[in-house]
């Protein structure tokens, strides 16, 4: 009985954020942005975060991502940079920016590996977090 309760609670710990994410990706993305990106890129995304002055390379102005790409938000490039697996160092510069996909995996895998194997994989949760963050970044683009 105790094991079933633990599994149920662990499942709930992942289902509730997933439901919140499904109902408001940009809101969840904003939360992810403030938690993971704002210290370097600033609360407004302009690259003026509290630790920006201490970095060797200034953080990018994320509000002009679409403008710098011919007016189209580069969703795949944003995904690749955040996830960190398929992207070469070139488009991003150095890897001063943390590989958030790897960090999201680290945060997710520990509890998720105890969930029902028939449920969503840890990778599903990671991809939802990255997608929400990208939705938020797309929403703060200047015209």
What are these regions (language model features)?
Residues 16-33, 60, 64-71:
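Electrostatic cytochrome c docking/interface patches
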Residues 1-12:
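Bacterial N-terminal signal peptides that target proteins for export
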């Amino acid at each position: 009985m105790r094991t079933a309760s633990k599994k149920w609670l662990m499942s709930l710990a992942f289902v509730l954020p997933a439901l919140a994410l499904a109902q408001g990706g940009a809101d969840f993305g904003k939360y992810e942005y403030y938690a993971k990106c704002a210290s370097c890129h600033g609360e407004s995304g302009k690259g003026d975060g509290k630790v920006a002055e201490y970095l060797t390379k200034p953080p990018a102005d994320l509000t002009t991502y679409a403008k710098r790409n011919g007016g189209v938000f580069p969703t795949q490039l944003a995904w690749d940079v955040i996830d960190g697996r398929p992207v070469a160092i070139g488009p991003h510069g150095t890897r001063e920016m943390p590989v958030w996909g790897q960090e999201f995996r680290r945060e997710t895998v520990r509890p998720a590996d105890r969930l029902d194997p028939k449920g969503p994989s840890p990778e599903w949760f990671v991809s939802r977090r990255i997608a929400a963050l990208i939705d938020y970044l797309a929403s703060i683009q200047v015209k």
